[in-house]
């Protein structure tokens, strides 16, 4: 049921199936608007204004324009057009407020806003949104058709090299990439550390492909008996801060991995083809002592896609790996078991879930 008007939005109208389907098609055709508006709201720190204002507080677009330092006299009107879209997606709330000049829309934070605001570095999906919609990443999508018809990874078609090489040539994008990974990691790791008890017997832990070290730093902060090693490409760890109990080591996981009794990998295997994953897991096997384990943190795809949140999340992520990575893909539990069987590891044990990711253990036989 949708409410339509002759100006006052009070007359109910029930959409028939044809109108509902057409409306959905129109929404899909216009879908680019929402993430780009949301990206701007994050980058302009508008979401932070709402998040810090708190539940039940409403702010006018004139106040927001002032707080973000807008010099454009039309900014309040432009912001209203942006924010009403965000309110329609439950990122914000909205109500009419009467004033001397008549009624105006004012906005406040909805619960979803707190997951997208910067949260003073305490975990956010906002930087991941910015990464996925950065101009460097977006260019890949324009090569998808050619990839399907002719081959050639879209990111490499767009930029002449694979993503992980490109980050070493573009300092700005390298920072955007690292921030997207780091802030998503904080959010996921908080939940993971509450739900997963598999670090208690670990003495030396290597985070393979650990980016700037957020994963292992949070693990070591809670499990202080662990010696943590953050292992990634040299240009990646060059951007890494110092953490107590963590050593940053530069290298290539396809060539060697530091010795450890446990290896942690979050969102690493999904970036690579099965052949590449076998090479990575073989290097992990060489690194681990007998009985050592890999702690994998990855999404798990359902067998049949459905119109639900789980399918939307994992299949969207899968298509990101499709265009940006060389053979990258999301996998099922059976897919991970097939990789494990080729590399000498035991059956994959699925332990627990942390937001959109699953924690799995693979033991060296």
Curated annotation (Swiss-Prot):
Its EC number is 2.1.1.129. Belongs to the class I-like SAM-binding methyltransferase superfamily. Cation-independent O-methyltransferase family. S-adenosyl-L-methionine binds at residue 232. One of its GO terms (biological process) is methylation. One of its GO terms (molecular function) is O-methyltransferase activity. It comes from the Eukaryota. Catalyzes the methylation of myo-inositol into ononitol (1D-4-O-methyl myo-inositol), the first step in the biosynthesis of the cyclic sugar pinitol which has osmoprotective properties. Pathway: Polyol metabolism; myo-inositol metabolism. SUPFAM superfamilies: S-adenosyl-L-methionine-dependent methyltransferases (SSF53335), Winged helix' DNA-binding domain (SSF46785). Leaves and roots. The levels found in the leaves are 25 times greater than in the roots. It catalyses: myo-inositol + S-adenosyl-L-methionine = 1D-4-O-methyl-myo-inositol + S-adenosyl-L-homocysteine + H(+). The gene is IMT1. Induction: By salt (osmotic) stress. Keywords: Methyltransferase, S-adenosyl-L-methionine, Stress response, Transferase. This is Inositol 4-methyltransferase. It is an enzyme of class 2 (transferase). The active site is at residue 270. InterPro entries: COMT-like (IPR016461), O_MeTrfase_dom (IPR001077), Plant_O-MeTrfase_dimerisation (IPR012967), SAM-dependent_MTases_sf (IPR029063), WH-like_DNA-bd_sf (IPR036388), WH_DNA-bd_sf (IPR036390). Gene3D superfamilies: Vaccinia Virus protein VP39, Winged helix-like DNA-binding domain superfamily/Winged helix DNA-binding domain. Transmembrane segments: none annotated.
């Amino acid at each position: 049921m949708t409410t339509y008007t002759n100006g006052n939005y009070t007359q109910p109208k029930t959409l028939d199936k044809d109108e509902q389907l057409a409306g959905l098609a129109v929404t899909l055709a216009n879908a680019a608007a929402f993430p780009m508006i949301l990206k701007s709201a994050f980058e302009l720190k508008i979401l932070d204004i709402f998040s810090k204002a708190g539940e039940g507080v409403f702010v006018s677009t004139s106040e927001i324009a002032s707080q973000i330092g807008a010099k454009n006299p039309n900014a309040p009107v432009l912001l209203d057009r942006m924010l009403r879209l965000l309110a329609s997606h439950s990122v914000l709330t909205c109500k009419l407020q009467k004033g001397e000049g008549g009624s105006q829309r004012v906005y406040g934070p909805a619960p979803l806003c707190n997951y997208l605001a910067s949260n003073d570095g305490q975990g956010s999906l906002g930087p991941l949104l910015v990464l996925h919609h950065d101009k460097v990443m977006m260019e890949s999508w324009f090569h998808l058709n050619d990839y399907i018809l002719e081959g050639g990874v879209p990111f490499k078609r767009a930029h002449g090299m694979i993503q992980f090489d490109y980050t070493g040539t573009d300092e700005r994008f390298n920072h955007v990439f690292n921030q997207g990974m780091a802030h998503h990691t904080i959010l996921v790791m908080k939940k993971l550390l509450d739900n997963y008890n598999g670090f208690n017997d670990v003495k030396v832990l290597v985070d393979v492909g650990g980016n700037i070290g957020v994963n292992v730093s949070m693990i070591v902060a809670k499990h202080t008996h662990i010696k943590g090693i953050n292992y990634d490409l040299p240009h990646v760890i060059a951007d890494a801060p110092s953490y107590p109990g963590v050593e940053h080591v530069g290298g290539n996981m396809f060539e060697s991995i530091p010795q450890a009794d446990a290896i942690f990998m979050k969102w690493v295997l999904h970036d690579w083809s099965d052949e590449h994953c076998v090479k990575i897991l073989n290097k992990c096997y060489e690194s681990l002592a007998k009985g050592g384990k890999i702690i994998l943190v990855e999404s798990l795809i359902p067998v049949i896609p459905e119109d639900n949140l789980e399918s939307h999340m994992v299949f969207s992520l899968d298509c990101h790996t499709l265009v940006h990575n060389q053979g990258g893909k999301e996998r099922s539990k059976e897919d991970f078991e097939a990789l494990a069987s080729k590399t000498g590891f035991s059956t994959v044990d699925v332990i627990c879930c942390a937001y959109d990711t699953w924690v799995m253990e693979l033991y060296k036989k």
